[in-house]
Amino acid sequence: RFLCLSTDLELADHLPNLAYVNYVSDPKEWLVLLRVPSLWRVLVPTDGSLSDDELRSDKIKNGIFDRLVGDGASVKTEHRTLYRVHQRVAKSFREGRVMLVGDAAHLNNPLGGFGMNSGVHDAFNLFEKLEPVLKGKAQMEPSLALYDRQRREVTHSFTQMQTKENMAFIKGGQDGAHEARRAKMLEIKNNDETRRNYLMRQAMFDSLAQ
């Protein structure tokens, strides 16, 4: 599970060069810092031995912000939320005339932002199948079966795989695998064609053609 702490404290005043989405990789404590319109959200993995009340306590909150900015007791939070992370894919994205898209069809950890984006791609793909059916230009059965096959395949081959890889990477910290991936990313950065292909895949544009 993740603990999400929301605060109006301007973290950028304490941590230079923050982006709107920041993944902090550390073997002792990894976390995510997200900027939303009026708040910063701090997402941290939780200790499974602690109760919900303990995880949402001032003690936990203070410790997290002590390590982030110092003087955690003075940091006010607007929300303290616990939520469970799943890696699941429905056996079928279709049940008769009912079609599943987004979180109804698949769940994954939030590292990389693939959940919402893949849901948008589901809807886009389904629209492409439904429009000709509704206009009488295509048969419903093969069209909906194709949607199910295409989107489940992409979910398994990319979204699930990539989010699991992201989780392993951020949890690993500065180990050998981390250094190897950093070296690989530098190679990608320095090659125009490789960089474009990588960005197309990460932006999930490649999956639209599958």
Kindly give the residue locations of the regions a language model identified:
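C-terminal helical "tail/cap" subdomain of flavin- and related membrane-associated enzymes
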Residues: 129-210
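Detector for Asparagine
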Residues: 17, 22, 62, 108-109, ...
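Conserved flavin/dinucleotide-binding core of flavoenzymes
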Residues: 59-62, 66, 88-99, 210
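General N-terminal targeting signals
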Residues: 22-24, 40, 48-50, 57-59, ...
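Conserved FAD-binding catalytic core of PHBH/FMO-like flavoproteins
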Residues: 1-85
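Charge-rich, low-complexity amphipathic helices
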Residues: 27, 55, 83-87, 99, ...
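Conserved mid-domain beta->alpha element of the FAD-binding
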Residues: 77, 83-160, 164
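Short, exposed beta-strand "edge-strand" segments with a Pro/Gly-rich flavor and a Y/T-containing core
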Residues: 51-55, 112-116, 126, 188-189
